[in-house]
């Protein structure tokens, strides 16, 4: 069992079947699953994506300035983070949102030592606004924050896949799922686990990653308890 984890949630996971925005039923289910692992005395930090609201890369592809599009994505992660905080606190889980871009009226600024102190007090810390810099994904944010707070693992909860495959299982019936794989293989084979910056950061800092489906309730707890689930990525 892990003692301190970073949970990476894709923005799309929050949209549920509607595909856009925030599905209250889904976010309440995720909040309950997070509560389950906090009750095991596990320290939990969360990084949320923004794909349910906005994608910087998509805006850039349509002619928008890339940096501007990325900043819009960072703001969208704050909306998702506040929604998750609200769902957590509604069921009695104390939490804090920390943002990489200061907006003191709605959240704390990101301060590493303060984040660690919150975790030690068993508060869930939600890291929002990415790294605060354009051109960096929320996957990279998860890797960076995991290294900074010395998390033991990153739990990557996906909404459309249950692990890492050698091909896209949605289009290739013969795609095979890996139980374990190395970061070097992920980078060498160009597997779509996380972007190369995030993968390299995890590899260099020896942070294992568990990729699994968020759609099956209880999977977060299973991953934390070390049950065989999804795909584990580690080492070189």
Curated annotation (Swiss-Prot):
Activity regulation info: Allosterically activated by GTP. Inhibited by UTP.
Where does this protein reside within or beyond the cell? Cytoplasm
Database matches in SUPFAM superfamilies: Carbamate kinase-like
Keywords attached to this entry: Allosteric enzyme, ATP-binding, Cytoplasm, Kinase, Nucleotide-binding, Pyrimidine biosynthesis, Transferase
Which EC class is this protein assigned? Answer: transferase
Provide the reaction this enzyme catalyses.
Answer: UMP + ATP = UDP + ADP
* Function according to Swiss-Prot or TrEMBL: Catalyzes the reversible phosphorylation of UMP to UDP.
Q: What is this protein called?
A: Uridylate kinase
